[in-house]
Amino acid sequence: MSVNQMQIEDVYAVLNSIHGQVTGNADMVAINTSNFVSVANTMLQQNTDAVYSALMNTITKTIFSTRPYSRQFGGLIVDNLKWGGIIRKIQFGDTDAVADEAFHNIVDGQSVDHYIVNKGDVLETRYYGSTVYQDVMTVFRDQLVNAFSGPEQLGSFIAAKANEVNNKWTQWTEDLARGLVINAIVAKREQYDGWQEHPGQVLHLISMYNDETRSSITINDIKAGASAKPFWEYVRAKIRTVQRMLASRNTYGMMQINGHNIVRHTPYSRQKVYLLAPYMDLMETSTLSEAFHNDMLQYADYEGVAYWQAIREQNNDYPLDRVRASTYVYLDIETGKYRNANIGEEVPFVDHVLGLIFDEDFTSINIKDTIVQNTPMNARGLYFNTWLSAHASYLQDFTEKCCVLLLD
């Protein structure tokens, strides 16, 4: 079933399915407009509550089964099978090789012990908890009766309600995913920026460019003028370098819990690249855009993001490349536990965010336990309610690779 429109034959199929559910009789079916009205009237007269419940269940089940996530950050959604392998993660750290030349120094009358124990470095992390999403839609009896007055009306009603459910679901999951991205940017900048033991946490691209080229450009210089083209060529090269570093087995862009020598690599096919679209537009007009997209981005999950957090603030001073968070979650590498950092009232901005490149296991969301419940008709108000409920579980694993790119 299309979310935007329905063919007449699809409407007949829906009506016949509802008729079978409500009456338990599959003999009387709708095959034309006249027959459609007869079947619809029979159902409504017999049990209006059951008709409404069957109709809404049909609509919502179609939406949830197809999951058309045409929204930003869609790559962060994982299914139950993938999530089951994430909530309890077993990781193995590198241990030093044993310097042993016993086989070169065999001595008569002595044995060589080959039962020496090396238990290895094993790290187990667990992720718990979920949040509940719940929303309600109200449909009046007059709307339901009008919907069953003909196949075109029912098709329009189904398409409208399907769009309503899909839009609510899409917006909710996008907001959750956006929150995870914002948390990653703020936590990386506040907690891990500048760690020499673990490079690649945050790259300050303008400062790096000025240091390497002995220039003194600012954020305004990269938008137009003579400095724009060489700078964006530099950024394009740095993005390729970051992707190559993430693909190599090292500690670039990740944190290690003390006492555990976990080393990772992220193949290009498992990299996610989220970059701010307005800046990407500048890059494409300043460099060979086709060559850029034919680089390593073609192998990664690349997405141009319209804005990071909001399109405007109350004082109209909220650029598209700015994020802020009054609290964020980060990994305490001393204890291996996650902590909440309350910044307080003076919430710092993270300005000029170009984007982030990360492993697909760095952050994700799982939507589960989707439930649709319909109320009987309200006897006084003559309306029905449909409640949509679901649980959302999400994680952010700072022992996985993630590099934040800032234009400062």
Predicted regions mapped to residue ranges:
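Extended, compositionally biased alpha-helical segments that mediate assembly or anchoring
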Residues: 1-66, 288-408
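Alpha-helix boundary/N-cap detector
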Residues: 6-9, 31, 39-54, 152, ...
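Generic detector of well-ordered alpha-helical segments enriched in charged/polar residues
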Residues: 9-16, 52-60, 155, 170, ...
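Short glycine-rich, low-complexity/disordered patches
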Residues: 31, 69-76, 174, 186, ...
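Assembly/oligomerization interface modules of large self-assembling protein complexes
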Residues: 50-137
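Intrinsically disordered or highly flexible coil/loop and linker segments, enriched in small
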Residues: 68-69, 167-178, 248, 395, ...
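Long, contiguous amphipathic alpha-helices that act as assembly "spine/axial" helices in icosahedral shell
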Residues: 121-195, 382-390
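Extended, solvent-exposed, turn-rich assembly/linker loops in the middle of proteins
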Residues: 190-323
